[in-house]
Amino acid sequence: MSLKIHAFPPSPRGFKVISVAAHLDVPHEFVFCDLTKGVQKTPEFTALNPNQRMPVLEGDGWSLWESNAIAQYLATLKPGLLPMDEKARADVTRWMFWESSDWDPACATLIFERFVKGFFGGGPADPAEVEKGLTKFHRAAKVLNAHLKGRNYICGGQLTVADFSIGAPLIMAVPAQFPLEDYPEIRRWYAQLAALPAWQKALAMGQMPQAA
């Protein structure tokens, strides 16, 4: 089976998929898709994902979009990040759904206002939107921080794909100025993820390629 990962590595959602594939050593071809040049709006990419968003996993005659769906699919290909027990696997899925519904939107607001707008020349951050983002961030961070107390990982005491999913937005913690000072459990847990070889490999891929 031939797989291609179409992604923009600096994006947390692209990073999520790339880091899972790297950790599991899933054979694939990586296709760098430059968001800054509008690659996602081309007819070729739209055929893979009509939403015109990254990342996308492309197989032989099929494609899969939504970063958590891709990450979980990759975790089924090799053992290591997805429990075999049905209840434990449901717990992983539960936290990945939470990442999509609560954690990612909270982080994404701050990332957009404090980093993306400036990067793309979209002007300064909107204070009202930043305040909304901070409210959402603190609400979600309190849940995550409390859950991590006494735990090394999100689910069942072992590293799972849920850790990669929830940890991915934190690669933007510095430029987006995430207020993590009140959340020591998140900082401790994230330090473990950041030390993973696959995490470091994916971070290195996030460097924008130089023009030819």
Where are these regions (language model features)?
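GST-like domain detector, emphasizing the conserved glutathione-binding G-site
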Residues: 1-131
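Residue-level detector of family-conserved "landmark" positions at structurally sensitive sites
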Residues: 31, 67, 183, 203-204
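Conserved beta-strand edge residues that scaffold enzyme active sites
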Residues: 35-36, 162, 207
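Structured helix-beta-strand junction loops
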Residues: 51, 77, 150-151, 196
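Active-site-flanking alpha-helical
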Residues: 75, 169-170, 203
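GST-like fold's C-terminal all-alpha helical module
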Residues: 83, 87, 95, 99-195
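Long hydrophobic alpha-helical segments typical of transmembrane helices together
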Residues: 186-212
